[in-house]
Amino acid sequence: MVLVAPQQEQGALWSPSPPTPGSGAFVVEAGRPAPAPSEAGRPAPARDEVLALLRDGSGQRPRFDPGLSGGLRAWLEDAAADLVARRGEDAPPLFLGPRFLWNDPVAAADPVGTAVDPVGTATDPYPTGWVRSCLIRALFAQVVTTGQVDSPLGDALDALRVDPGRSAMARHVDELPGEARSALAASLRIHIENLMNLTPRFAAGWLPRTHDRVAIPLAGGRVVLNGVFDLLVGAPVPGRATLCALGLTTGGRWAQARTALHYLALLETLRSGTPPFRLALLHSAAGRYGVEDVLEEHLRTIVSHVVVQLSTLGDRDA
């Protein structure tokens, strides 16, 4: 496999950029025979290779030191206690999602946003990138569940309308001028075409679950690390890495999207005591994907990053 991630490291397999039209068949190789082209001469869907990479080595899934999670949490608790001391005991709880790991939230890998980690501002409550990201994630959940999308914009809006936290966004899209709405619909068609090619079709035994929320309270709940997995598959087994996590980026910086996925892997480690086995990152705008093992060094690196960022917060964040 051609490696185009920022740098090569153990356990990481990254796809090349998608081929340009007319450049011929594109077959990914990753240490095993690549899926055979279809009878029409087209390459097999990338989702077959993503699934193969997630399954590879599943019979020898690693065990982790039972004390790993406790050690990581202790490190974070110390940093959170220092932050609480700076903010004051009466300060409201601080909810921190992956976006707090970089100083420029506008350049975030994906402006997902939640009720406690909003993206919009008073002057621009529904930034275009955020709206697009939410619509694409709604479609991604539909692809995982049903394997098909009939009307990208219509299906995505239907999903947002039944979500109390997103219904106002659906009304905002309904009220867009015709030209802006058409441009959004055209953009969604490109993203969903790539997602249909990238997203594996998981059997029920994989226990696929979308929008899996995780929150880790620190310092007695005064600091909460939180995030949302786009997709988790597998059943947790104490002491053994068994889960696979799939993350989605809709067009932001690849390195930041990967960091956000490592952050979520850390939260899962703190929640269950065991990290995920493997991570996959899908880029819906470019049609790229990457698959990597979760290593202890990834977890320690992301904890170090979190601790550094916590040390920069204080009274201004209250």
Over which residues does each language-model region extend?
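Metal-dependent nuclease catalytic regions and adjoining charged, substrate-binding loops involved
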Residues: 5, 11, 268-318
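A non-catalytic, helix-rich entry segment at domain boundaries
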Residues: 127, 131-212
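An acidic intrinsically disordered interaction segment
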Residues: 80-100, 219-236, 295, 310
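Short acidic (Asp/Glu) and glycine-rich catalytic loops that position anionic groups and cofactors
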Residues: 99-105, 241-245, 280-289
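Generic solvent-exposed, charged/amphipathic alpha-helical segments
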Residues: 189, 193, 261-265, 307
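C-terminal, charged and often intrinsically disordered regions of DNA end-processing helicases
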Residues: 1-135
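Short amphipathic alpha-helical face segments that pack within enzyme cores
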Residues: 134-135, 259-267
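Non-catalytic protein-protein interaction segments used by genome-maintenance enzymes to assemble
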Residues: 210-262
